[in-house]
A protein has these predicted regions:
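Bacterial N-terminal signal peptides that target proteins for export
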Residues: 2-13
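C-terminal motif of bacterial Sec signal peptides marking the signal peptidase cleavage site
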Residues: 21-23
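Short, low-complexity, disordered segments immediately C-terminal to signal peptides
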Residues: 25-53
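Conserved HGGG/HGGXW glycine-rich cap/lid loop of the alpha/beta-hydrolase fold
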Residues: 61-113
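Active-site loop/oxyanion-hole signature of alpha/beta-hydrolase fold enzymes
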Residues: 105-146
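Conserved hydrolase catalytic core segment
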Residues: 140-178
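Conserved serine/cysteine hydrolase catalytic core
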Residues: 182, 192-263, 268-269
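Post-His helix in hydrolase/transferase enzymes
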Residues: 269-281
Length: 286
């Protein structure tokens, strides 16, 4: 589900560096306070790590450094994508529950520890960045894709662009391609301007059409959608329209599953247990 980007998560994890340390240690605390500063804040790595090694660095993609943190292991790698207004550190609590599973988190361009660039870019650009990032870091497919909010819609786009690389998808209250069609016609220009005034510089509203064009290419893998049923939906949407469209979306997938949670939109911070359970089930093929 979309939220206005400048609201973001609101209780963002203070340091992205905790992501790798939490996953490696299997540690339990959800509190990121006191985390040590990552060495990637001082230097940018240009040499790809060897296969099977842990990663915690900036990887050069198209001339700029993108932050990537991965833990090795057997089986498909679980790749996490944050929402607009979030960062890779938002997944720390979830990763601490998945220390035995290979995982990767990253910051998109203009986010967190990743480099900044001027101008605007598309969601398709983000997908190509992620594909190049994983290749440069020698993180081989298959992947289980996990995304929150806008990051979830981008993971659907990744699956539609590279279907042979994907074994499963977990969507944590993800923005979905049909949402712009729920907006009243006379408000769409204003909503577009509001959504596109985001700190990432991504064409948020244009991503809806990009994602819709790829829906038919999403592979028939398990897709779990975790819905924060207590969130406040945009007031301009007709009552019940979102829920009906969400059910149609899930029912239209070859292997779709909807899980309703007594939570709002901020599932990575409020429902890490539910996300971790869904990821583990998908990882194990249950």
């Amino acid at each position: 589900m979309r939220h206005i980007p400048d609201q973001g998560i609101g209780r963002m994890v203070a340091s992205t560096a905790i992501v790798l340390s939490a996953a490696c240690s299997g540690g339990g605390s959800d509190d990121a306070s006191g985390a040590s500063e990552s060495p990637t804040q001082q230097a940018s790595a240009s040499v790809a790590p060897s296969a099977g090694a842990a990663v915690d660095e900036l990887v050069q993609v198209k001339g700029r450094g993108l932050y990537l943190a991965c833990t090795p292991g057997d089986g498909p790698t679980v790749v996490f994508s944050h929402g607009v207004g979030g960062q890779s550190g938002d997944w720390a609590a979830t990763l601490s529950r998945l220390a035995d599973i290979p995982t990767c988190v990253y910051d998109r361009v203009n986010v967190g520890l990743s480099d900044k660039e001027a101008g605007r870019h598309s969601a398709t650009d983000d997908i190509e960045d992620l594909h190049a990032l994983l290749a440069a870091a020698e993180i081989e497919p298959p992947y289980v894709l996990v995304g929150h909010s806008f990051g979830g819609m981008e993971m659907l786009m990744y699956a539609g662009t590279y279907p042979e690389d994907v074994e499963g998808i977990v969507l944590a209250d993800a923005t979905l391609p049909f949402e712009s069609q729920l907006d009243p016609l006379d408000q769409r220009a204003e909503i577009r301007a509001e959504l596109n005034a985001n700190p990432e510089g991504v064409d948020f509203y244009g991503a809806y059409a990009e994602a819709r064009a790829l829906l038919g290419s999403i592979p028939g893998v398990p897709v779990t959608y975790l819905f924060g049923a207590q969130q406040v939906l945009p007031p301009e949407w007709e009552e019940g329209a979102y829920e009906a469209a969400l059910h149609r979306f899930i029912d239209g997938l070859p292997d779709g599953r909807l899980v309703e949670l007594a939570a709002d939109h901020d599932l990575p911070l409020d429902e890490p247990d539910a996300i971790a359970e869904a990821v583990r089930r998908t990882f194990l093929g249950e």
